[in-house]
Amino acid sequence: MPIVHPLEAITLDLDDTLWPVLPTLVAAEATLAQWLRARAPATATAFTPQARLALRRQLLAESPERAHDMSWLRRELLRRALIQAGDPPDLADAAFEVFLAARQQVTLYPDVLPVLQRWSQRYRLVAVTNGNAEIDAIGLGPYFTGCVSAHDIGCAKPDPRMFHAACALAGTDPAATLHVGDDFQLDVRAARAAGLQAAWLRRPDLKHETPPDGGAHADAPAFDSLHAMDAHLHPRSPLG
């Protein structure tokens, strides 16, 4: 489905759309591990990837209604790990803040800043994320009207309430709003189901699912960069 003008707002996913998230999370885990080794060595030893996965599964089984809240999951996971290792559980909040701060140390894709600068002069931009990246801490706040997060809304994509909240924040109708994201199900199809237009950003350095019909174009056009998407939106004045 082609993008229909006029557009009034663009909503953007964050992780794996504006930056690759895996290197960020790996670095944040390493920063947290170093902090734990200094302050809760027993937890640092026991807090292996396998232990984290087991605790995460336990938390999701106990509190499925909190599955959307990555910050709660991480904080509670740390608290449980500290208790199991015999370290003070009140270190959980400080440990979480260490992880959260490191999680904001992202490496933007090269096309992000020039395109955001341009789009922010034409459209209202709203971030839409299931994670706990913070646009102000990352330095992108000036380009955005605001951010809709699963933690704040109480649900996660593909729930249409995420997209409707973004449109409300932008003050636009869904039909005049374009959502941009890397995940075909959570971004493209979910946005279309919520009444928004959608564009699929398929970064070449990431693996992307193949839609059931073999292509995205029935739901949304696909692009390999924000530059390519911008050139499609504004064919007479593409970015250089």
Regions found by a protein language model. Give the residues of each.
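Asp-based, Mg2+/Mn2+-dependent phosphohydrolase catalytic module
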Residues: M1-I10, L22-P23, D87, L113-V126, ...
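N-terminal helical cap/lid subdomain that shapes the substrate entry/recognition surface
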Residues: I3-P110
